[in-house]
């Protein structure tokens, strides 16, 4: 599992990284 800290808060912004959709 990748680090969740790579994702944006709430996964609303694409700038959080490629893992954003994974965390959602």
Swiss-Prot record:
<keyword id="KW-0044">Antibiotic</keyword>
<dbReference type="GO" id="GO:0005102">
    <property type="term" value="F:signaling receptor binding"/>
</dbReference>
<dbReference type="GO" id="GO:0031640">
    <property type="term" value="P:killing of cells of another organism"/>
</dbReference>
<feature type="cross-link" description="S-(2-aminovinyl)-D-cysteine (Ser-Cys)">
    <location>
        <begin position="21"/>
        <end position="24"/>
    </location>
</feature>
<feature type="modified residue" description="6'-chlorotryptophan">
    <location>
        <position position="4"/>
    </location>
</feature>
<keyword id="KW-0929">Antimicrobial</keyword>
<feature type="modified residue" description="(E)-2,3-didehydrobutyrine">
    <location>
        <position position="2"/>
    </location>
</feature>
<feature type="cross-link" description="Lanthionine (Ser-Cys)">
    <location>
        <begin position="3"/>
        <end position="7"/>
    </location>
</feature>
<feature type="modified residue" description="3,4-dihydroxyproline; in form A1">
    <location>
        <position position="14"/>
    </location>
</feature>
<keyword id="KW-0078">Bacteriocin</keyword>
<keyword id="KW-0208">D-amino acid</keyword>
<comment type="function">
    <text>Lanthionine-containing peptide antibiotic (lantibiotic) active on Gram-positive bacteria. The bactericidal activity of lantibiotics is based on depolarization of energized bacterial cytoplasmic membranes, initiated by the formation of aqueous transmembrane pores.</text>
</comment>
<dbReference type="GO" id="GO:0042742">
    <property type="term" value="P:defense response to bacterium"/>
</dbReference>
<comment type="similarity">
    <text>Belongs to the type A lantibiotic family.</text>
</comment>
<feature type="modified residue" description="4-hydroxyproline; in form A2">
    <location>
        <position position="14"/>
    </location>
</feature>
<feature type="cross-link" description="Beta-methyllanthionine (Thr-Cys)">
    <location>
        <begin position="8"/>
        <end position="11"/>
    </location>
</feature>
<keyword id="KW-0379">Hydroxylation</keyword>
<feature type="cross-link" description="Lanthionine (Ser-Cys)">
    <location>
        <begin position="13"/>
        <end position="20"/>
    </location>
</feature>
<feature type="cross-link" description="Lanthionine (Ser-Cys)">
    <location>
        <begin position="18"/>
        <end position="23"/>
    </location>
</feature>
<feature type="modified residue" description="2,3-didehydroalanine (Ser)">
    <location>
        <position position="5"/>
    </location>
</feature>
<keyword id="KW-0425">Lantibiotic</keyword>
<protein>
    <recommendedName>
        <fullName>Lantibiotic 107891</fullName>
    </recommendedName>
</protein>
<keyword id="KW-0883">Thioether bond</keyword>
């Amino acid at each position: 599992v990748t680090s969740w800290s790579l994702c944006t808060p709430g996964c609303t912004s694409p700038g959080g990284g490629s893992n954003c959709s994974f965390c959602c």
